[in-house]
Design a protein with these regions (language model features):
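Glycine-rich, proline-tolerant flexible connector loops at the mouths of alpha/beta enzymes
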Residues: 67-89
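Active-site beta-loop-alpha junctions enriched in small/polar residues
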Residues: 74-76, 102-108
Length: 116
């Protein structure tokens, strides 16, 4: 039988540092919002969005003014991969918008994304 008393207490105080952000009473510029709806939102749907629905939704997010958009998880399905290809091939990503993808940290998967 294992006994819990063999473990030392695990409390570690936070390091002392100057937290200037915590002392501010206002923000000086607006935050940058990143939409993750195309990835996280799509995973929660019973029937995931089609390629055309994803393209329409991406255009809508751009129209709303998002400057950072997580576009998907291309290694998860062919639809996700084709969606990313369509964004690139159809030049749908505006110059002032940054897109990101979610992926596993595996060489062959990362390399396949680089070559999209």
């Amino acid at each position: 039988m294992m006994h819990a008393d063999k473990y030392k207490p695990g409390y570690f105080p936070a390091p002392r540092c100057e937290m200037r952000w915590a002392k501010k009473d206002h923000i000086e510029k607006p935050p940058i919002w990143c939409s993750v709806d195309l990835r996280d939102g799509n995973q929660s749907l019973i029937v995931p969005m089609s390629l055309e629905e994803k393209l329409d939704f991406f255009r809508f997010l751009v129209k709303l003014g998002f400057k950072e958009i997580e576009v998907g998880f291309p290694a998860a399905s062919e639809t996700e991969y084709e969606f990313l290809r369509a964004l690139i091939e159809q030049h749908l990503i505006p110059d002032d918008v940054t897109v990101q993808v979610l992926t596993q940290c595996r060489d062959h998967i990362i390399l396949s994304l680089i070559h999209i």
